[in-house]
From Swiss-Prot:
UniProt KW keywords: Iron
Origin organism lineage: Bacteria, Pseudomonadati, Pseudomonadota, Gammaproteobacteria, Pseudomonadales
Protein name in the entry: Probable Fe(2+)-trafficking protein
Keyword Iron: yes
Assigned GO CC terms: cytosol
Amino acid sequence: MTRTVHCRKYKEELPGLDRPPYPGPKGEDIYNNVSRQAWDEWQKHQTMLINERRLNMMNAEDRKFLQAEMEKFLSGEEYAQAEGYVQPKE
């Protein structure tokens, strides 16, 4: 049976992740409060931000920026977009 969580982003019960994506309390929080759908969408958005903004994951400031954007994205707040990106119409 699929594990469900009350997703922080979508405010509804959705299938959860199979395991925490990070070690420690942050990973446990995501595991318990973020759906697989929201996490998959974040990973795509994260890749777009890294590529479009040319973020260097060796740079502490770039990692801090990405961490803050992840919090915003997964909480349903307004978050940074890649410059010139237009969301596809559903």
